[in-house]
Structures are given as structure tokens and as C-alpha cells.
UniProtKB/Swiss-Prot annotation:
<dbReference type="InterPro" id="IPR002792">
    <property type="entry name" value="TRAM_dom"/>
</dbReference>
<dbReference type="Pfam" id="PF04055">
    <property type="entry name" value="Radical_SAM"/>
</dbReference>
<dbReference type="GO" id="GO:0046872">
    <property type="term" value="F:metal ion binding"/>
</dbReference>
<dbReference type="InterPro" id="IPR006638">
    <property type="entry name" value="Elp3/MiaA/NifB-like_rSAM"/>
</dbReference>
<feature type="binding site">
    <location>
        <position position="159"/>
    </location>
    <ligand>
        <name>[4Fe-4S] cluster 2</name>
    </ligand>
</feature>
<keyword id="KW-0949">S-adenosyl-L-methionine</keyword>
<dbReference type="InterPro" id="IPR013848">
    <property type="entry name" value="Methylthiotransferase_N"/>
</dbReference>
<dbReference type="InterPro" id="IPR020612">
    <property type="entry name" value="Methylthiotransferase_CS"/>
</dbReference>
<feature type="binding site">
    <location>
        <position position="152"/>
    </location>
    <ligand>
        <name>[4Fe-4S] cluster 2</name>
    </ligand>
</feature>
<dbReference type="InterPro" id="IPR023404">
    <property type="entry name" value="rSAM_horseshoe"/>
</dbReference>
<dbReference type="Pfam" id="PF00919">
    <property type="entry name" value="UPF0004"/>
</dbReference>
<feature type="binding site">
    <location>
        <position position="77"/>
    </location>
    <ligand>
        <name>[4Fe-4S] cluster 1</name>
    </ligand>
</feature>
<keyword id="KW-0963">Cytoplasm</keyword>
<keyword id="KW-0808">Transferase</keyword>
<keyword id="KW-0408">Iron</keyword>
<keyword id="KW-0411">Iron-sulfur</keyword>
<comment type="similarity">
    <text>Belongs to the methylthiotransferase family. RimO subfamily.</text>
</comment>
Length: 437
């Protein structure tokens, strides 16, 4: 009789897709999937190990399950970095699976059921799933993430992604479009393209970046919203901006992780080319696409970051008027160049700088959101709050999980795009009412 398996997903949306493929494969093989860990014979945990706090959450989850005596299958980034340590410290782990091996999850479970303790971790991940691999989506019905490439060829000083995910490997345009059509047939209204560096999509496969060509091809798919995450500054070329302009279903939403503004800090981060580009890039986007939404992520407390460097970053944020900003305190990670740099910043200073920068951005976000008041915009309805008699959704300026939401009054329907008049704004969210023409 097939075993019952509970699955826990931790970490980023790239990890989520891997989890969804494992769920699809297990279900196809006849295994029972249950959200209740108490009823499951096995618990599969897809872990994150990108930065310290994520690793702590993964370890805490594993320890809690071990204390309950569960048979644990550990997948994802944590085994990729700490295979031997996990096998030694968590005897309840009946199997571990690396980031390049999740497509063999059925084999792993079957071998573990015979009593074998399975360790399947490729030293260098090379696998990437395509449209033929089964997938069981865990997002709302109308939203799907689509991985266009895996891995990264860059070596930023603070980042361990190349160790966790390997070098970049892109999927063919035809494969991505085929999966997008599958998702459209399932009722998906918003498709979110993800990879480590989306603007480098195709470089390894075609000899040059081809994100613009991919977007044009996806313009022929019946999905109203196509959103791109993880754009690299140098990849936002005129050709790409033109593709966004000319492709009706591609949202002018630019998620561009800049990390810092000061040339000295960027040089230490191994991103020296970026400093002169930042301001000109933002100006060019807004000139071409006045309705563009701009999101970035920044790191404070990087080794050697002085108060002058931090002041430069604050001035840059104030001048740039981003719609959304995520701020991370630098996390010192083994196997990165930054771990060995002099001038490591005390935790208290990192926390203070993060707090100060977030407070600065709150004022800007309030102003940017307030500019939406009075407009009628499409909102994707994702949830109903029956107690408060409101709907929760997102306009095109909000990406799931990382940005805000729109609180909607009036008659709406789940998983549909509804016209909403925006009536109020906070630093993070909007309020509105269903618009009757």
C-alpha cells in the first residue's frame, strides 16, 4: 500500500516550484499526500539555506519533526550544503535529496521504504524541470510561478546560490511557452517568471540573452498578466523595454535587486559595474514606461559599510522613489568571499540601519500608493474575508507575498480580474470598491 506523505515547503518561490514537482511526482506514483503531519508516514521538508535566518528556520522545522519521531526526507538547499552534517545530527532523516535531484523523489521514497538510508545529492546540480514533469500547484488557482532558468553564473561576494543551484541553465522558449499554455488551460490569470537572473535568460542556451523574445512569445498565450522577477540591472536593455512596451500582457513591473548604491560597497560585493548604472537605469525605465512599478532589494551592514556609505544609500533610496523595497541585514555565509572580508559590522548596527532604511521607504511607499487613489484598476481577487465582508486581491503593482494587497468592498468573484476604484492607501496596501461602469 502506498505511504502517506506530508510536505513542508520553506524558502523562495524557486524552491516552491521544486516542491510542486515533487508533489506531482509522488501523487502520480500513487502516494497519498496529506497536509496533516500526524497522519503521514513520511514528512518531506524542502529546505532553504540562502541566509542564516532561513537556515535556522529549516533546522528548527527538522528538529521539531525529529522530536515527534517522524520519518523525515530532507530536500533542497540544506542537504546541498550540509549533507554529511544532516545525516550525522538527524538520525530520523531517512533520506536527503539535493537541489539537482528532486526529480528522483519517487525513487528516493521507494528505496527508503526498504530500509535503506538514501543520500542523493549531486555535487554540481545540472537538472532543470520542463513542461513534462508532473506538477501539483500550491498557489491560488489564478497564480502560477514558472521557472525559466536555474542556477547562476555570477559570483556576488555575499551569495551562495552558485553553490546551492549550480551554473545557469535555461529552458528553451518552446518548453516555457508549452508550460504556460498548460497553466492557462488550468485557469491561471497571472504568470510569474523566475530564475536567479531573469535578464540573462537564454545566454547559456542561445549565446545571447533572449528574455525579450520569450516575453513576445508569451504575449501569444491567453494569460492576462505576465510578471518578471529578478531582473539584473545590466540586462534591462532598450530591446527588453521595447518588448515590455509592446506586449500587452507583460506587466511594466521591474523587480531589480540593486543591493547597494555606493561604488565602494558595490565593488566589495563584486558588482563594480553597477554604480554608474543605477540612477540612469531608473530614469530610462520611467521615461519609457511612466506607469512602471519599481521594486528593489538592498543589503545593509555589508562588511566595510561605513556611516557615509549608508547615508549614500539612504539618499539614493529617497531620490529614486521606489514603489517597493526589501531590506536585508547582511548575513555572513560560509563559502562566500564576503565572509573573509575585514570590517564585519556588529549585528546591532545592521539592525539599526535596516530599521532606519525601512522607515525612510515607508514614507515613499505611502506617497507612491497614494498616487493610486481615485484610479480604476484591475484587481485579481484571491481571497474572501467573510467576517469583514471584504475581498483581498492585488493590482498589477503588487506581486504575491512580497508586496501589498488591495482590500476590496463590493460584489466580486474569486480568481477573477475585477475593476476596482482605489479609495485609500497605506504604506503597504490599497483599499477600493468594485467599480460599476
Amino acid at each position: 500500500m502506498p505511504a502517506t506523505i506530508a510536505v513542508t515547503h520553506l524558502g523562495c518561490e524557486k524552491n516552491r516550484i521544486d516542491t510542486e514537482h515533487m508533489l506531482g511526482l509522488l501523487a502520480q506514483a500513487g502516494y497519498q499526500i496529506d497536509s496533516d503531519e500526524d497522519k503521514a508516514e513520511y514528512v518531506l521538508v524542502n529546505t532553504c539555506s540562502f541566509i542564516g535566518p532561513a537556515r535556522t528556520e529549516s533546522v528548527r522545522t527538522l528538529v521539531n519533526l525529529a522530536e515527534q519521531g517522524k520519518k523525515i526526507i530532507i530536500a533542497g538547499c540544506l542537504p546541498q550544503m550540509f549533507r554529511d552534517e544532516l545525516l550525522k545530527e538527524i538520525p530520523e532523516a531517512v533520506a536527503i535529496v539535493g537541489t539537482g535531484d528532486y526529480h528522483r523523489i519517487v525513487e528516493v521514497v521507494e528505496r527508503s521504504r526498504t530500509g535503506e538510508r538514501v543520500s542523493l545529492v549531486s555535487a554540481t546540480p545540472t537538472y532543470i524541470a520542463d513542461e513534462h514533469l508532473p506538477r501539483y500547484r500550491t498557489t491560488t488557482e489564478a497564480v502560477a510561478y514558472l521557472k525559466i532558468a536555474e542556477g547562476c553564473d555570477y559570483r556576488c561576494a555575499f551569495c551562495i546560490i552558485p553553490h546551492l543551484r549550480g551554473d545557469q541553465r535555461s529552458r528553451p522558449i518552446e518548453s516555457i511557452v508549452a508550460e504556460a499554455k498548460q497553466l492557462a488551460s488550468e485557469g491561471v490569470k497571472e504568470l510569474i517568471l523566475i530564475s536567479q537572473i531573469s535578464t540573462n535568460y537564454g545566454l547559456d542556451l542561445y549565446g545571447k540573452p533572449r528574455l525579450a523574445d520569450l516575453l513576445r512569445a508569451l504575449g501569444e498565450v491567453d494569460i492576462p498578466w505576465v510578471r518578471v522577477h529578478y531582473a539584473y540591472p545590466t540586462g534591462l536593455t532598450d530591446e527588453l523595454l521595447t518588448a515590455v512596451e509592446q506586449t500587452a500582457n507583460v506587466l511594466p513591473y521591474f523587480d531589480v535587486p540593486l543591493q547597494h548604491s555606493h561604488p565602494e560597497v558595490l565593488r566589495a560585493m563584486n558588482r563594480p559595474w553597477q554604480a554608474d548604472l543605477n540612477t540612469r537605469l531608473l530614469e530610462r525605465i520611467r521615461e519609457r514606461l511612466p506607469e512602471a512599478t519599481l521594486r528593489t532589494t538592498l543589503i545593509v551592514g555589508f562588511p566595510g559599510e561605513s556611516e557615509a556609505h549608508f547615508a549614500h544609500l539612504c539618499a539614493f533610496v529617497e531620490r529614486s522613489e521606489f514603489d517597493h523595497v526589501g531590506v536585508f541585514a547582511y548575513s555572513r555565509e560560509e563559502n562566500t568571499a564576503a565572509a573573509n572580508l575585514e570590517g564585519q559590522i556588529p549585528e546591532a548596527i545592521k539592525k539599526r540601519r535596516r530599521r532606519d532604511l525601512m522607515r525612510l521607504q515607508q514614507t515613499i511607499s505611502q506617497r507612491r500608493n497614494a498616487s493610486q487613489v481615485g484610479r480604476v484598476v484591475p484587481v485579481l481577487i484571491e481571497q474572501e474575508n467573510t467576517q469583514k465582508k471584504v475581498w483581498l486581491g492585488r493590482s498589477a503593482r503588487f506581486s504575491p507575498e512580497i508586496d501589498g494587497q488591495v482590500i476590496v468592498c463590493g460584489g466580486a468573484a474569486l480568481n477573477q480580474l475585477i475593476p476596482v476604484r482605489i479609495t485609500a492607501a497605506t504604506p503597504y496596501d490599497l483599499c477600493g470598491e468594485v467599480f460599476q461602469a
